[in-house]
């Protein structure tokens, strides 16, 4: 009989810590809904005590997602845990994930606490969390570099207090598969009450072994939960990729003898959504979700696949959600057809007014390009949700003039808190002139550190998707804009990034777990 492997997604918490990957509340809700469609077991929606923005995002997700357990991170103190419980209150099912560092280095230099103090605080934190839920996860931060005897003492203590999941993180991505699996196995064998908890792993990819370490811990160490993110999103080199561990376990069920509850046909839609929202492009040769993951260029391979797919394909593209682009709607399509397609794509707009506004954008786009694809519709929805996000800056219109031998000129009209502003400037090119026209009015002082353009679909009529990354005072944000006109998409992306910079939420606490 096979065991169940729990998939714990932390895209919205640890994934968001990747520089530039900060998301709005509305964007987090969209991703959470997609994770629910993916049938993720646990969604770590954020760190409630880190900022009011995270608290509100967690509470909103708890209100709308009903089929996955919603989790908030909390430091091992009453204030953090109570804040997490308050944010999670609307959820059908919720978990509190509390943590404290257990390595000698962290205890001495960061916490300035003795081992006995850390042991007691860990136990008291779990005991306090039990007032709110029976589903409690505990993580010993920097556990892989902790003294084994002390680590086992702490974990035995928190299990005795009611912790139901124990997570042993490879905080700095230093572990190797056999050694990490042995750590999990040894700790489980040394703790007399280890059978009272589910054992979890959380790996970082600094040495490119996050997936390998996680799978080794499952196969050889007895772990039954993997903490991961869509596309491996995360700070530094990223986290364990959800899509890779899930498909490894499903494809090699003969080896792992594990079941996962994931609807794998939702993997590619989830990957595309996270990429679109964060602006982090998926590399073409990325396993499972890369554009070339199922492409065969070799003539020998192509011949084999045509004769029998399993000659060179160990999994089918359609099983993970890859589908050929379909023309789904056109300029003669009506509102009901548009609404039906939104439902098929899993998009839930909050009101009829938002559906009407999105449909109006669709009709505008249909006048500009004859063929409308699913990716176009998703871009429309993304733009529409940004319009309803109480933006400080909002794009209205753009005009430009460019002739050979002359410097391009741009005129941008946009709102600042509802007040219409017009910026004009010249530049080295149309995009440069446009961004200077905006910056001349807002004077943000932000540094442009990345500008990239991608076509959403094939063909010369495709919408362009522009990603702009801005840096200011140590904060890095991404903005994404879409439009058939690349220059207009650039203006939208720049204003979207400025909106995130304008967010007055206190800089969040980003724990290294």
Swiss-Prot record:
It is an enzyme of class 2 (transferase). The keyword Cytoplasm applies. It comes from the Bacteria. Its EC number is 2.3.3.13. It is found in: Cytoplasm. It catalyses: 3-methyl-2-oxobutanoate + acetyl-CoA + H2O = (2S)-2-isopropylmalate + CoA + H(+). Mn(2+) binds at residues 14, 202, 204, 239. Residues 5-268 form the Pyruvate carboxyltransferase domain. Its cofactor is Mn(2+). Keywords: Amino-acid biosynthesis, Branched-chain amino acid biosynthesis, Cytoplasm, Leucine biosynthesis, Manganese, Metal-binding, Transferase. Pfam families: HCS_D2 (PF22617), HMGL-like (PF00682), LeuA_dimer (PF08502). GO terms for molecular function: 2-isopropylmalate synthase activity; acetyl-CoA C-acetyltransferase activity; manganese ion binding. HAMAP family: LeuA_type1 (MF_01025). Belongs to the alpha-IPM synthase/homocitrate synthase family. LeuA type 1 subfamily. Catalyzes the condensation of the acetyl group of acetyl-CoA with 3-methyl-2-oxobutanoate (2-ketoisovalerate) to form 3-carboxy-3-hydroxy-4-methylpentanoate (2-isopropylmalate). Homodimer. This is 2-isopropylmalate synthase. The lineage of its organism: Bacteria, Pseudomonadati, Pseudomonadota, Betaproteobacteria, Burkholderiales. The gene is leuA.
